[in-house]
Amino acid sequence: MAKNLTPSDAKLEITQIKGVIGAKQNQKATLRSLGLKRIGHTVVRNADAVTVGMLNTVPHLVNVEEAK
């Protein structure tokens, strides 16, 4: 999951693993800001401070891996 993330020059593969029904409004907005629209959707983002902060807001809704 998205635990112990720190900003770096790496790329992250972020996959939404749970839906947003019942999630708080700020969590829904965070997922949309990351570019995630549905369960199973994957995006690749830089591991900068902004992205890491967003991922720390929704660690229970996403799966994060380092992109190859």
Swiss-Prot record:
| GO cellular component annotations of the record | cytosolic large ribosomal subunit
| InterPro entries, per the entry | Ribo_uL30_ferredoxin-like_sf, Ribosomal_uL30_bac-type, Ribosomal_uL30_CS, Ribosomal_uL30_ferredoxin-like
Q: Which domain of life is it from?
A: Bacteria
Q: Which UniProt keywords apply?
A: Ribonucleoprotein, Ribosomal protein
Gene Ontology MF terms in the entry: structural constituent of ribosome
GO BP, sorted A to Z = translation
Q: Which HAMAP family did the record assign?
A: Ribosomal_uL30_B
Subunit note: Part of the 50S ribosomal subunit.
The family classification in the record reads: Belongs to the universal ribosomal protein uL30 family.
Q: What is this protein called?
A: Large ribosomal subunit protein uL30
